[in-house]
Amino acid sequence: MAKFKIQRAKGREGSTIYTYTANGHNECVATRLWDKEGGGPNDIEGGKMIMGITWFTPGGSIDYSSNPMESIYYVLEGEMTMTIEGGEPVLLKAGDSFHCVGGVSKSAVNTGEVGTKMLVCLLPPQD
C-alpha cells in the first residue's frame, strides 16, 4: 500500500470526493474529502484521518452531538458559534479553529448574515 495519495477535485477523473447530508446537520452541505468511502484514510499505509468541508447557510447548524473522534473545526469563511454542552458559546471567525477530544457534546450555528465554510478534520480513536 502506498504512503501517500493525491485527491483530485470533485468532478475530475479519479476523484472520490462526495457530498452528503449528515444527521443533525441543518441548512448545510457537507463534502467529504477523505474517509473510508471516499478514498481514505485506509487507502494509505497507516492512514486514519477523516477530512471534509461543510458550507452553512445563515442560521445553518449542527445539533448537540458527540462522537468518539478527536475533532478540529477551522473556519475558512464567515463565522460560527460553537458551544460545548453546558458551556458558554464561543464565536469563531475566519481563521479561528476549535479543537476537542472525542466524546464531547457540542453544537455549532452560523450566527452571521452570510454563508460559512468550515474545514472539518476528524481522527478516529486509535486501536
Summary of predicted features, one role per range:
Residues 1-48:
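A short, N-terminal "cap"/entry segment at the start of jelly-roll beta-barrel domains
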Residues 29, 47-52, 71, 78, ...:
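A generic structural signal for short beta-strands and their flanking turns/coil linkers
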Residues 32-40, 50-67, 102-103:
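Conserved short histidine dyad/triad with adjacent acidic residue
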Residues 53-57, 67-82, 121:
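Short, conserved beta-strand element in jelly-roll/cupin
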Residues 54, 72, 99, 113-127:
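A short hydrophobic beta-strand segment most commonly corresponding to one strand
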Residues 62-64, 82-83, 100, 106-113:
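Short beta-strand His + acidic residue motifs that chelate non-heme Fe in jelly-roll/DSBH
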Residues 68, 88, 104-105, 114:
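A generic "binding-loop/recognition-motif" signal
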Residues 86-102:
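Short acidic-glycine-tyrosine-enriched beta hairpin
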